[in-house]
Amino acid sequence: MRISRPGIWYLNPYLSDTNREQLTQGNPNLESEKNHSFDLQFGSFAQKLSYNISVGYNFTDNSIQSFQKMVTDNEVAGLQNPTGKQVLYTTYYNMGKTQSATFNGYASWSPFTSTRLVVSTWGGYSHFSDGQGLKNHGWSMSVYAQLQQTIAKTWTASASVFKMTPGVNLQGKTMGYFSHTLSLRKSMLNDRLNITFTADNPFQKYYHIKSNSSGKNFATSSTIKFIPQSFSIGVSYRIGKLQSGVKKTERTITNDDVKSGGGGSGKTGGDNVGS
């Protein structure tokens, strides 16, 4: 069993009223999720080909889900100057019962010493229920691939793509996503100096994120448009020599049991599977 504590944005009682017709508020009374999972893995690691495959099943009886409903704004605690009109109110509850069957795959292939191909994929079928008749289910999948080629020893070119299908949540779904990256690295001074040119989504001028949500007496659809392109130059220089040796063990504590997310004004539904 894995316990996931709600992140600060889920707990924050601050009322986001930037859009007076779509209000969002955290819930400080949330409890930690209790997740149960079963996994089966198989892998092989060799010089030219390495891969790992896993299948799993997990379920949560008190999962944290965002929930939307239509209310009159004078019912919302903390709202300044209510008018009595209908608004879409979003908050979070331990109301979800989730079940997911998943598949993960990873492969790294080097047909030549100068060429490397990496592919990673995830897929799953999920079922959401609030225990009171509200249900949603569906498939989702993501694929990442990267091809890296060394040219004349000091030049390295790489291209990568990422594709994610639409994700589902308790009250709706979100649109899928696609991105691509090109990079070129030049190594000099015996690999001490590296200059990297990177282009993110150079062939995609605009991107639209769409989401749909529905409930009792309402249905919403939203679209966010933004420019995904970026171009950058990175320079790194290594000082000194790399030396092998015994490194003293450092004791650290890492808290990775926090469920992230939440906090978006007008957020349309709970955590998406596949996002």
Predicted regions: what they are:
Residues 1, 43, 52-56, 106, ...:
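Transmembrane beta-strands of outer-membrane beta-barrel proteins
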Residues 29, 39-43, 52, 104-108, ...:
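Outer-membrane beta-barrel architecture
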Residues 1-5, 36, 44-46, 57-61, ...:
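Transmembrane beta-strands of outer-membrane beta-barrel pores
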Residues 19-26, 35, 83-92, 101, ...:
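Extracytoplasmic loops and strand-loop junctions of Gram-negative outer membrane beta-barrel proteins
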Residues 25-27, 31, 46, 50-120, ...:
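Outer membrane beta-barrel strand-and-loop segments of large Gram-negative receptors
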Residues 1-36, 57-84, 202-216:
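Surface-exposed extracellular loop regions of Gram-negative outer-membrane beta-barrel proteins
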Residues 137-275:
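Conserved C-terminal beta-signal and adjacent last beta-strands/turns
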